Amino acid sequence: MKKVILIADDSPTIRKFVSFSLTMHGFEVVSASDGMEAMEKLPAHKVDLVITDLNMPNLDGFELIKSIRGNEEYKDIPIIILSSLSGSEDVEKGMSYGASSYLVKPFDPKRIHYEVSKYLN
């Protein structure tokens, strides 16, 4: 059975690129354009890992992480932040909210696959 990854990013280009890369490695990918849509999609899919941007409308990545970590059913899902915010305070905040890893855009697709594989293999 394929592992399911939920990608939350307001950029259609990023969602398509990451989805294509992960699909080529045998993962099933579910996409959301913001944190609110991501939270709506969690119950409909057995999500094994979340990749999220931080700057998104409606519900940003920080709030998405807090919502996932605060939900008994989803609290143990690994969460990888993929963001253009590269300051140490952003990394610290993301990790303190419960992120498992933090990757900075622009990114190497091999690095995303490596990070995903750490949690799903």
Model-based region annotation:
Residues 107-116:
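C-terminal output helix
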Residues 56:
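Receiver (REC) domain active-site loop signature in two-component systems and cognate sites
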Residues 45-51:
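Active-site beta3 strand of CheY-like receiver
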Residues 26-33, 41:
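Short hydrophobic/Thr-rich beta-strand motif most characteristic of the beta2 strand and flanking loop
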Residues 16-24:
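Charged docking surfaces used in two-component/phosphorelay signaling
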